[in-house]
Amino acid sequence: MSYERVTPRARQGTTGICVEMDVTAGNGVWIQPPDRVAAVTIAVHIPSGQTGSFTIETSCNRPETLGENATGGYWDNVYGDGVTLNENTVVMIANAVTGIRVNCISGAINVAFCG
């Protein structure tokens, strides 16, 4: 799977985050929540008339371990091992993690990170 990073950790500061990206099957998007953001809301939407399946994962490894492409470290599915979602989903995660990533398994999705 290929991941695109939507925002670097050091560039957001106290202004918060609000970014989104369209993601297609076999790709993903990830973020390192800024230190001063208390929580991040992840909203995943499947475009009207389309289908899509995806996972949402978090990691607590050091940013250096995660790397620039989010393929390092250990990642945990927030809904449990092997759980794949296939409907619009919104979840809030406290900023006690170093990385959040969304994997598009099939179809197409829109992913937004706000905090």
Regions found by a protein language model. Name each.
Residues 15-19, 63-78:
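Surface-exposed loop/edge segments in extracytoplasmic proteins
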Residues 3, 56-59, 99, 107:
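Compositionally biased regions
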Residues 1-18, 108-115:
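Short, intrinsically disordered N-terminal pre-domain segments
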Residues 22, 26-37, 73-115:
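Beta-sandwich interaction modules
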Residues 49-70, 111-115:
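Short, surface-exposed beta-strand/strand-loop-strand elements in extracellular ectodomains
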Residues 38-42:
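Structural beta-strand segments of beta-rich domains
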Residues 45-49, 105:
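Solvent-exposed strand-to-loop "edge" motifs in beta-rich extracellular domains
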